[in-house]
Amino acid sequence: MRLTRITRVVLAIGLLISLTSVAKAAETPPSEQESIGGTPPRLSFTKGEVSFWRPGAQDWSQAQVNTPLAPGDQLYTGPQGDLELQIGSRAFVRCWANTQLGLENHEPDFLQFKVTSGYASFDLRTVEPGRTVEVDTPNAAFTIEHPGYYRVDVSAERTSFTTRRAGQATVIPAGGEAVIVEPSEEVVISGTENPQVTSYAAPQLDAWDKWNYARTDHLLDAVSARYVSPGVYGVDDLDLYGTWRSVPTYGTVWVPRGVPAGWAPYTTGSWMLDPYYGWTWVDTAPWGWAPYHYGRWVSVNGFWAWAPGPVVVRPAYSP
């Protein structure tokens, strides 16, 4: 009985904070809401050693899936590490081993990353008109405004940047002039002072490129996409970890599989202080993004279900 009461208290607190956050967001003037992108980049996948650092932290900590990134955040993959960020409903950033990636800026139409070392891919199946993704390295900056597959490899004295699938970008070497990177092209920037820029035909896809292609194809083939708004992140996880049901009052809802008896929302995770959104729920379940940032949880015949709400063009993100 006591455990049941504790669960109810925790759930009530979680739902209260969530509803307060939604109300606060609704009261915020549009100019303030639009000063940062509507949905933060989501850490959607990790494998092996992946570390996270936020400005003000004493040290690096283990990265947690479903963490929303804020400007200034840093991620690092160890020798056997991999990570994935979702930055759009059809756009992903992935890092291979020994890579440091930072989020420098996040605005409605501008997303800026910095790759200090290692290997990063930007698989952008869609880029909204007017939106720019910038990738900074120690000796050059790359701007992307078109869908495509982009890969950047960074070492101490050399950066290579490759475009594929009709991708096109602009490179500005440190202290140099802008150069267009055409589709299926590789540019290599050598040196940090007065860097030299050379261009080649894009090399053949390697094993990591092929893995990136296949993973994105898989993520975009989610059945759950039929039931949620197109801008919702983490839809593929709903296929793997739950089922959809039609119930009176709420219509089509999603029910998680494999949760223990007596489980309730807001009991498997923690609140993180986001520098822009304030207190934000970070759930430890791999599926714990969409059900906590869109729609609402409802109790149906003794079990909890997520009601995504009506399908809209631009769903509102809630911390």
How would you label these PLM feature ranges?
Residues 1-11:
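Bacterial N-terminal signal peptides that target proteins for export
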Residues 8, 41, 46, 63, ...:
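Functionally constrained cores in energy, signaling, and assembly domains
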Residues 3, 19-25:
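N-terminal targeting leaders that route proteins to membranes or the secretory/organellar pathways
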Residues 18, 36, 43, 68, ...:
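Generic structural signal for beta-strand residues in well-ordered domains
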Residues 10-20:
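Bacterial N-terminal signal peptides
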Residues 25-186, 215, 221:
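Flexible, surface-exposed loop/linker segments and immediately adjacent secondary-structure boundaries
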Residues 188-319:
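Low-complexity segments
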